[in-house]
Amino acid sequence: MSNDGSDHSDDEEESFSMVREATNFFLDRRRDVYINSVLEHIGGFEKWSQLNNDCQRTVVKFLDYKSRCQLAICSKIDYDLVNSVPMNIHGIGFSEEYEHPSVKVCVEFEKNSNKKFELIFEQSLNDTEIKWTKYSNVLLPEKHCIVIENSKYYEESVKFVEKWMKKCCYGVSSVKVGMDNYPLETSHIKDLPNCRDVMLNLKNENSVRWWLNKMPHHMHDLHISPATFREHNEVTLSPDILTLPQITNCEKLYLYHKTNISNEQFFELKAKKCSFNSSNITDEAINKFIKNWINGKSVEGFKEAFLWQRSTSNTEEITKGIEIRPWNEQFQRENAKFWSDFSEYCYSGRCYQISSNINPYNSMTLNFINNCVSIHVTGLAKKKNGMPYTKYVSPKSYTFCNPIRL
């Protein structure tokens, strides 16, 4: 909820949710009806040759990968047609496996679905073995393997990634990169204009910069971490990387490398949710950040911030000039479920509730624990029978995963 004084009743919120679900349902139905009408018109491809090129391209655009392959082997003309229409691929992930030298590549056709395939590239003497498992609802999993003779597994995995990037005209929405030695100089990837969700598991800063520069300036979700979390203190991201628009404009920003984010850079971020090393951010800056939210001057839709690697944090300095309500025994009795959910989400330490000046029924939680200061919007203004009240909501209800504890 925004911090502008607006509020909705629980009934209204439930109605909004039902409308969204109904809208998505009918959009899917409309798409299915459209595809079925096309299939009926072409008579199960019996009238395929009667369609003009534009109609054929439209049909191919909606085909899944298996159907595209089946159509492509019908004729040379169909083969060229299929290859000329970009494939719908949601995301591509590729990463090195460090326990056993290999590269894992995953091609995801739809978001959060089983429509994907995963391959493992391994070296076997002078050859490359490509392994995958075929799953079935009724049969036992089948393991498959093909061999590319006189080849190197790393190079073959790169060729595969480049090939599939080209198949979708570099239009993926999600990318997960975990190959520090990816050959950037010879890559054909120039731009990934549709990418909104990015995970870079890299310790090479040049690789981080190279991949970020391929992304659009406004992204939804960005994770940058070393290859393993044991290495999170071994590499420090340079200040110039932290000023890239791909970072400053990102809605959800998670940085697990060491960073030297300054007070000024902290206030430049547009993130609604963020987590990063904040050893250079002063207590006075955190105080100002909280006051901005109290007075409705923070990032619109702000949800939470985890500020890590703070050797010392002065509670009095951070809360100076701010009215706070400690989470004492009375607060715990009044909000037992919320207290339990919050503690499960991020380990509650010394917690304080802070109300908004715009709408006092909106509030945030300030949490001090170990080497971290975390800030969460948890109190939402609601109405019941026309009477306003505060509904406390645990951050886990609006977060897709718990933050990594550095």
Curated annotation (Swiss-Prot):
Q: Which cysteines are joined by disulfide bonds?
A: none
List the source organism. Answer: Caenorhabditis elegans
**What InterPro entries does its record include?**
F-box-assoc_dom_typ2 (IPR012885), F-box_dom (IPR001810), She-1-like (IPR042317)
Check the record and name the Pfam families matching this protein.
F-box, FBA_2
Task: Supply the name of the protein.
Answer: Uncharacterized protein K06H7.2
Q: What domain of life is recorded for the organism?
A: Eukaryota
